[in-house]
């Protein structure tokens, strides 16, 4: 699969990113390079290799799984440009 100028233009439009026409070829090349690396990774034989999250084995401290709201709603909403009834108010994002 190869990424074309039209693919870059479409992704930019869907993600609402302004991409100048003169950069479309450059970005298509970069994305094709990334996809090439992914193809190389897919060729690696990982049969029998245990999944890991770190090269150093560590133990994370355990704590009780307790549901809490944090009791800091006012502090959190203080950072919001706008809130109503204890919730963030954001602009409509779906057309």
UniProtKB/Swiss-Prot annotation:
GO terms for molecular function: asparaginyl-tRNA synthase (glutamine-hydrolyzing) activity; ATP binding; glutaminyl-tRNA synthase (glutamine-hydrolyzing) activity. GO terms for biological process: glutaminyl-tRNAGln biosynthesis via transamidation; regulation of translational fidelity; translation. InterPro entries: Asp/Glu-ADT_sf_sub_c, GatC. It is an enzyme of class 6 (ligase). Pfam families: GatC. Belongs to the GatC family. NCBIfam families: gatC (TIGR00135). This is Aspartyl/glutamyl-tRNA(Asn/Gln) amidotransferase subunit C. It comes from Hyphomonas neptunium (strain ATCC 15444). The gene is gatC.
